Amino acid sequence: MKKQILYMVCATALLSSCHIYKSYDRPEDITASGLYRDPAADNDTLASDTTNFGNLPWREVFTDPQLQSLIEQGLKQNTDLLSAALNVKAAEASLMSARLAYAPSIGLSPQGTISSFDKNAATKTYSLPVTASWQVDLFGQLLNSKRNAQVTLKQTKAYRQAVQTQVSANIANMYYTLLMLDRQLEITQATAEVLKRNAETVQALSERSTYTSAALAQSKAAYAQVVASIPDIEQSIRETENALSTFLGEAPHAIKRGVLEAQELSAGIPLQLLSNRPDVKAAEMSLASCYYNTNSARAAFYPQITLSGSAGWTNSAGSAIINPGKLLASAIGSLTQPLFYRGTNIARLKAAKAQEEQAKLSFQQTLYNAGSEVSNALSLYQNTSKKAESRQMQVESAKKASEDTKELFNLGTSTYLEVLSAQQSYLSAQISQVSDCFDKMQAVVSLYQALGGGRED
């Protein structure tokens, strides 16, 4: 009867411990589909992905040689990325430690004594024992620790990739900002030159009483207004250069760069699975880590079995001293079963379960955020593409209006105020076109980042 009870207890313990051996699987109630909003329809979602835009190496997306050089510098020198790489090394060391926990621990404890009683001759004894102990992982304590270390390593690698993606995207955005500011400065300076010539012409004509002093004042005011905006653009360029230099891990300096018109980015923007995003991977690995922590907390309720032994030479055999020494060996098996730890194990298990639920919620929210970022970037790309043709028409029309108004002014059938208005419209249209071009490039960068791009070749 006692044997039957013992067998039943052992069987119950083994069955209840089966869960602690299970590997992590994504919970079924996690929503990972239908997260993209279709930019062509208000209420539809993109249920499936197409090609691997997010898997393209960054060199195939950012083809400007100057930009490629800057990204290479950033990937080598950015302090956040270097710190993330050190976290990976630390996680690799932790995994190595978890794997070595399966091996026995071996130690050497040599001892020697010299004793004398009542001035008799000294007695010398020695022992050279080698001790070893090995934990039998019957209930998964070591297994879950190793699995936890494995997913932690994956999490740190995913975080490093996320930082790398962020570094590439930030450098590209700042680079394109510089190109946009360069083009705005070029347009503004050209406009200022035109207004300067106009003001000089009006000045000469006003001296011959062809035009009133009001027209002269208007021409000078328009010129001064445009010239006054140039230092603001130059300051923005300087600040962006300094910010990019600092981000590269360098002292502030001028940035070599190309021109806005020469930039070529992917014309078609397909989607890729959100699982390609490193932050999504990191969030899921965090959930897996909490899962294994919960398993470890469960395993703490089960016995811990340890085998230990020692062997070595000694010349002490009880009360007798023998020379030469003899070989002494021993082996011990021990089982430690938790009975009452003042509620520590129960509290630890409850805390682990709560942390696992928190990680699950965080993972789901990360998926939602990722889907939103992809949808926003895709919508921005689509809308900026739609504006391109209309904006070009606006620029061409504003240019023609400016030229025609100037001709009418020279013929005396238009006022100088109309000339200024037409030139201002032309300037505004050109600046808007530059901003649209920048928005489109920024949309590509944002979408590439949102899809987890930024990997090396």
What is each model feature region?
Residues 196, 225-252, 393-451:
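Short segments within alpha-helical structural elements
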Residues 18-39, 72-137, 239-252, 264, ...:
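A small-residue-enriched
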Residues 82-83, 99-100, 136-164, 214, ...:
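Sec/SRP-type N-terminal targeting helices
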Residues 44-73:
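Regulatory alphaC helix of protein kinase catalytic domains
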Residues 81-84, 91, 149, 156, ...:
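Amphipathic alpha-helical coiled-coil segments
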Residues 19, 151, 158-269, 380, ...:
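Periplasmic alpha-helical coiled-coil/stalk elements that build and connect Gram-negative outer-membrane
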Residues 1-16:
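Sec-dependent bacterial lipoprotein signal peptides
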